[in-house]
């Protein structure tokens, strides 16, 4: 990646067979941000859960649809946008279950909300939803000369 690259976009079919590829890309993105190995794995888990939810809930297991993953590298944080073109979601209805009420397959939103620093649902596109996930780089945040939202250069 050269110093002018600040964004990576990946478009994949909504087929679970591509989740391994997406996990690899997300893991590498975390490493480029110098996150610890644990944080990289956690971010990867959050994105994997989000992708699974898109496939299952937005696309109703229709594997022919597209998901666009856009990764923005900033000095203070990593931003991951997952855009689907399926059934719109009402963000107010997306709530993690209490651990006492967990049943198989019911922890995705819980993991996403607990791993990521910010989780936002943008329902403004004509079709679908953009899930915006941010993970702050705590080692750079205190000493950053950039304001939140300014992009950094990657080596």
What is the predicted function of each stretch?
Residues 20, 26-48, 101-103:
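Conserved short strand/loop->alpha-helix "switch" segment adjacent to the catalytic nucleotide/phosphoryl-transfer site
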Residues 9-21:
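STAS-typified acidic loop motif
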Residues 17, 38, 107-110:
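Charged, alpha-helix-enriched surfaces in structured cytosolic catalytic cores
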Residues 1-9, 54-155:
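Conserved beta-strand-loop-beta-strand hairpin that lines the nucleotide-binding pocket
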Residues 14, 35-38, 62:
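Structural signature of the histidine kinase catalytic ATP-binding subdomain
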Residues 49, 53:
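Conserved polar catalytic motif of the HATPase_c/GHKL fold
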């Amino acid at each position: 990646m050269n110093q002018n690259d600040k964004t990576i976009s990946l478009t994949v079919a909504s087929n679970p067979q591509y989740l391994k590829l997406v996990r690899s890309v997300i893991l590498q993105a975390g490493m480029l941000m110098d996150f610890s190995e644990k944080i990289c794995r956690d971010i990867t888990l959050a994105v994997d859960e989000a992708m699974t939810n898109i496939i299952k809930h937005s696309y109703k297991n229709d594997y022919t649809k597209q998901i666009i993953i856009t990764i923005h590298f900033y000095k203070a944080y990593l931003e991951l946008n997952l855009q689907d073109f399926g059934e719109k979601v009402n963000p107010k209805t997306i709530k993690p279950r209490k651990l006492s009420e967990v049943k198989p397959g019911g922890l995705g939103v819980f993991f996403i909300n607990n791993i990521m620093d910010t989780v936002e649902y943008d329902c403004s596109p004509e079709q679908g939803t953009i899930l915006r996930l941010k993970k702050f780089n705590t080692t750079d945040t205190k000493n950053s000369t950039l304001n939140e939202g300014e992009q950094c250069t990657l080596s």
